[in-house]
Amino acid sequence: CRCSPSFILSQGDGMQLIRDLLDTAFSDVGVFDAVCVTFELAFGATAISSVLGIFLGLLLERARFAGKKIVIRVNRTLMGVPPVVIGLGVYMLLMRRGPLGRLNMLFTVQGMILAQVLIITPIICGMTYTSLISKAPAIRTFAKTMGADSVQTERLVIRELKKELYFAVVTGFGRSISEVGAVMLVGGNIKGHTRTMTTTISLLKSQGIFAEGLTLGVLLLIMAFIIQSLADFFQK
């Protein structure tokens, strides 16, 4: 029985075995925990950024106001800002004497997620906006000729642009899972708590353990490929 104590125990033993094998293979730098933190961070930041980015992209495309071009340029600038700059800004906000110091989010996964949301959201917003301005007007014109109301029209726009929106989300996920500078600044690269696969690779490099760093990089690439393949499958 899958719910029996023996099955649960065997599952726990299996996870512990995987943990021990990974830590032994990679000089006990906490690779198993780093894998868990990496995907908790990547999925959490991507989920939040997707909701914010797509909503802001839709809002920016529909809104008409003075200074809209400036807002678009600012967003495009943020799309290319070095993550370490964002990380430094978040660090200053979350440090004990900072404006958000009372939240105690510095050197936590939650603080790292905040930093990555600020990095990823402009990317998803910009890609969403670009897709909308090129295709949304024609879709809305068609919807109006069919007698659709405003809500039905926007639903049709999102449905017709789902591939473009999916690509924007996947791009954000890729940026998240590969990020080093911001998460190292905000998270502190603490073993078992805020150390990710990319910061582990950086640590191994600084220690001169290049073979293990390269192996871990290949492992990260394989995991990202598997997740991408699963996402493509379910997207269809």
Model-derived regions: residue spans:
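Interhelical loop and adjacent transmembrane-helix boundary motif
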Residues: 17-30, 184-233
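Membrane-cytosol interface at the C-terminal ends of specific transmembrane alpha-helices
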Residues: 106-141, 157, 168-172, 229
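Transmembrane alpha-helices
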Residues: 127-128, 150-182
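Transmembrane-helix boundary motif in ABC transporter permease subunits
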Residues: 44-75, 150, 157-158, 230-233
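C-terminal transmembrane helix and the adjacent membrane-cytosol boundary/short C-terminal tail
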Residues: 126-140, 144-147, 151-156, 214-236
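Periplasmic/extracellular loop-to-transmembrane helix junction in inner-membrane transport proteins
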Residues: 7-46, 59-63, 68, 157, ...
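Membrane-interfacial helix termini and adjacent extracytoplasmic/periplasmic loops
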Residues: 7-10, 14-15, 19-20, 86-117, ...
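Hydrophobic positions within alpha-helical transmembrane segments of bacterial inner-membrane proteins
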Residues: 46-54, 58, 84, 88, ...
